[in-house]
Amino acid sequence: MSADVHTGRLRFTKMHGAGNDFVVLDLRNGTPPPDASLAARLADRHFGVGCDQILTIETPRSAEAVAAYRIWNSDGSHSQQCGNGARCVAAWLVREGTAQGDVFTIDSPFTAHRVERLDAGTYSVAMGVPQFEPTQIPLAGFAHARDEYALPVHGETVRFGAVSMGNPHAVVEVGRVDAAPVERVGALLQQNAAFPESVNVGFAQVVDPAHVRLRVYERGVGETLACGSGACAAAVVLMHRGRVERDVRVSLPGGELRIRWAGEQAQVVMSGPAVFVFDGEWNQ
């Protein structure tokens, strides 16, 4: 698929990973990327195509990569990391013939990702090494990493773990994820001065040591059916606390992901689906 975002016609591919949905644009022909206004209109579910994020395919930035991609949230802002998006980009590149073989590398705004095709619709992505130091998240007001932080938020104390997966995450452990105050607490933490770059907020329920249920309130989007980097963040925070095993199944409203982390300086590996929905053309 190719795109010309300034002539009125925009060809795209609609995809999703566990319900986290994307509009994929190929900008490798030199077409300039969409500005924030156009990205927000394209992502609008009533007046545009509708998606959580827009993924733009671009020429690689590193020698080992077959292509690069950037991420636009539905409000027009940028994101540094998107695990479900990485799998969808990988599947798109395989279908278009850009990626040869079952193992290859793609560049995200955050880092270069090693990708492996496990079968026709399932991919694993090396998501990078999690960063727990507050300065790297970033999380203001704390000098050293902790398993649990506490912040006073509108008269209540919110307790959470925090980690960067290339983007900031707070993880709130709850007894029942279905009853979690996702929108209320998610929005409050995103607006809190302790998170100078805002934050993705996950609400995680440990079902058993090999299974976690999760809902995520994302920056620039709101609650989504799935968040790949959020699943990684929840898993590693819970692994760090000894609450779950090093290989865990994460159930989100839109589907399931598998997260593996050997510990400390190892990369987190996420596996899950990448689904083509349709190809289309949008008349702006």
Swiss-Prot record:
The record marks 169, 218 as: Could be important to modulate the pK values of the two catalytic cysteine residues. It is found in: Cytoplasm. Pathway: Amino-acid biosynthesis; L-lysine biosynthesis via DAP pathway; DL-2,6-diaminopimelate from LL-2,6-diaminopimelate: step 1/1. The active site is at residues 82, 227. It catalyses: (2S,6S)-2,6-diaminopimelate = meso-2,6-diaminopimelate. Its main location: cytoplasm. The keyword Lyase does not apply. PROSITE patterns: DAP_EPIMERASE. It is an enzyme of class 5 (isomerase). The keyword Cytoplasm applies. One of its GO terms (molecular function) is diaminopimelate epimerase activity. Keywords: Amino-acid biosynthesis, Cytoplasm, Isomerase, Lysine biosynthesis. The record marks 278 as: Important for dimerization. It comes from the Bacteria. Homodimer. Belongs to the diaminopimelate epimerase family. Catalyzes the stereoinversion of LL-2,6-diaminopimelate (L,L-DAP) to meso-diaminopimelate (meso-DAP), a precursor of L-lysine and an essential component of the bacterial peptidoglycan. This is Diaminopimelate epimerase. The gene is dapF.
